């Protein structure tokens, strides 16, 4: 059994400030080495790959033991190195089964100005015997 059972309305938060090294490493792994990710802008920043930003909710899902079934992303604004991004995952539905919890979550990632840079959602399971 999980330490605490997931409940509708539960909110989990993580913050991260992406670095040049993060963007460069992700570019190597993903193959996304477009100029906007490799050449600094006039302020010396790199644009963070969208899927690198999308790792924020997966960090929370990993902490909760979620095995994702579906994920959707809407990238609304660019994210740059040096910006602190706050990711909030809200459990919107939860169904208890004999061996698992089935959950649906909404995700909102905001920059330091409070602007939503990414919205997302996912469905997944938390197996009871994993805890």
Locate predicted features.
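Hot-dog-fold acyl-thioester-processing enzymes
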Residues: 1-68, 131
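Extended hydrophobic secondary-structure segments
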Residues: 76-87, 108, 118-119
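Residue-level marker of beta-strand positions
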Residues: 11, 52, 84-86, 90
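Active-site beta-strand->loop segment that positions catalytic residues and contacts the acyl thioester
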Residues: 70-84, 92-98
């Amino acid at each position: 059994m999980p330490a605490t059972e997931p409940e509708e309305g539960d909110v989990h938060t993580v913050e991260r400030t992406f670095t040049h090294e993060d963007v460069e490493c992700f570019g190597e792994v993903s193959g996304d080495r477009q100029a906007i990710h490799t050449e600094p802008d006039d302020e010396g920043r790199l644009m963070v790959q969208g899927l690198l930003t999308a790792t924020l909710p997966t960090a929370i899902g990993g902490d909760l033991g979620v095995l994702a079934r579906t994920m959707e992303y809407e990238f609304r604004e660019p994210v740059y190195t040096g910006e602190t991004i706050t990711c909030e995952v809200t459990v919107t539905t939860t169904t208890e089964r004999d061996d698992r919890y089935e959950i649906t979550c909404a995700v909102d990632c905001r920059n330091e100005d409070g602007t939503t840079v990414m919205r997302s959602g996912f469905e997944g399971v938390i197996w009871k015997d994993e805890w």
